[in-house]
Amino acid sequence: MNIAPQFPTPEVTTGTLPASAKVHIAGEIHPQIRVPMRQITLHPTSGEPPVNVYDSSGPYTDPNATIAIDAGLPRIRAEWVVARGDVEPYAGRHVKPEDNGFASGEKLTPEFPVRNAPLRAKPGQAVTQLAYARAGIVTPEMEFIAIRENIGRKAAKDALIRDGESFGASIPDYVTPEFVRQEVAMGRAIIPANINHPEAEPMIIGRNFLVKINANIGNSAVTSSMAEEVEKMVWAIRWGADTVMDLSTGRNIHNIRDWIIRNSPVPIGTVPLYQALEKVHGIAENLTWDVFRDTLIEQAEQGVDYFTIHAGVRLSYIHLTVNRVTGIVSRGGSIMAKWCLHHHKESFLYEHFDEICDICRAYDVSFSLGDGLRPGSIADANDAAQFAELETLGELTKIAWAKDCQVMIEGPGHVPMHKIKENMDKQLKTCGEAPFYTLGPLTTDIAPGYDHITSGIGAAMIGWYGTAMLCYVTPKEHLGLPDRNDVKTGVITYKIAAHAADLAKGHPAAQVRDDALSRARFEFRWEDQFNLSLDPDTARSFHDETLPKEAHKVAHFCSMCGPKFCSMRISHDIRAEAQKEGLEAMAAKYRDGGDLYMPVSDEEKPSVGE
């Protein structure tokens, strides 16, 4: 391990969320693992136990953790990886000027201070979670995931309500490590976990598990810095992002990515083609297999957990996009289409896919097979180009599986609501039930500035139908690079979509948090309502805009109805009177015409301006 010279360290957001604590559960098969979750404490008057929720925020919300961005996070998986005996350290490649877009001097982002020798598979070995699963091995990663996915299930076992529609998914009442192994072995789930990203807490992406969300970050040629991108990553996972994609397209790509990975407790994905293009000065026609191969190894050594590879864009499909309203909207897809047309030959990604698999299996980099021909408008949804590419992605999935590589499939895009289910059904059939990972989809094209909403609608639907991971869309989609606030809005929007899908699919214990918040709402436990919400800060601030005093936090009304017309307060009164007089007497009273509003006392009247 080498340590580079010191320099100013970027600052990131830390600290617990309101009324929350970080708790850890130990493994049974692998006692050394400690699975984090967030425990939300309720008000003593509730008489209810704390509510545990899935937590992807890493040590940044742990008050007992020491955060040192220039040192990176604890390498929790390092011993697990080495103990398997199938990896070897080596010197790795040297960083070249083109890795950082030829940035130099003051424009060059400093290297990450700590450098560990990269690992790779020993000759003839596959070090993927898929290879282990097929061999019948339950890895520590698999047990870690089982504990994570079971949050709330054991406590709620007797009261589990399974009234959802899962559209053929096989969601168990209780997730065992063996179930995780089976799903991975069958290719229906992936565990993105590069052996060179030991800081990552294991998670799973699959139709029979909780729906996950991804947040995109990354610099561009005109804006953002390393410090901003590291903070965006930390900020995104604070609010619930399960993975993060670094889509940087400007200078300093290598060094920025190193800072992100070393400080990320969630899997990091990339589109290697973007960096490869920077290495040839942005000229797509000058891309070569050698440049791309070198970029794959560079990123695999750093610890990238999944690659988006646009190998499904074939020369013969490009003409199918000519009459589209919006043509080819995928950056990677358009780059490869331009390359294919210029050279009039098949993409080097398609031609060298076997070799790409060999690289991925040596580091356990999962495939995210890119949808380079996805529709960029609802007018182009479900067209011949989109589904031709999907057929090729199905073929590539089989090739990758044959080499023990983990695979998920990327999906659209822009799709109106009535065409969404066809996408899910075709993907399951064509790609052998490999996990589906979709961008939205956006259900209408008329709302720039609000595309987190247009896409959130489609995301909830396709998540219900079976998509395993949803890629967030921010309000800045189609308009500009998202900032910190946009990242939060996108993450919260997609947490709503993913959770709504979990509820609709009938995931056990998915409703525990909803019911706890509903009881708090009915009992006017305002602090519990805020703390149980996905965004406690916003919920509290909206309430306090009109009722700011501490006394209002225990009031039995809000500013929507006021004390006189509060429906829940009226319901409390009806319930109390019903218990007192009996249901039959109450029914007779209200048939005769009784008052259905509460009298308000002078003490409860809000003063002017409150």
Swiss-Prot record:
GO cellular component term of the entry, any: cytosol
Pfam family of this protein, just one?
ThiC-associated
Q: Where does substrate bind?
A: 216, 245, 274, 310, 330-332, 371-374, 410, 437
Keyword Iron: yes or no?
yes
Q: What class of enzyme is it?
A: lyase
Q: Which domain of life is it from?
A: Bacteria
Which family does this protein fall into? Belongs to the ThiC family.
Q: Briefly, what is this protein's role?
A: Catalyzes the synthesis of the hydroxymethylpyrimidine phosphate (HMP-P) moiety of thiamine from aminoimidazole ribotide (AIR) in a radical S-adenosyl-L-methionine (SAM)-dependent reaction.
User: This chain belongs to which protein, by name?
Assistant: Phosphomethylpyrimidine synthase
Give the organism, scientific name: Allorhizobium ampelinum (strain ATCC BAA-846 / DSM 112012 / S4)
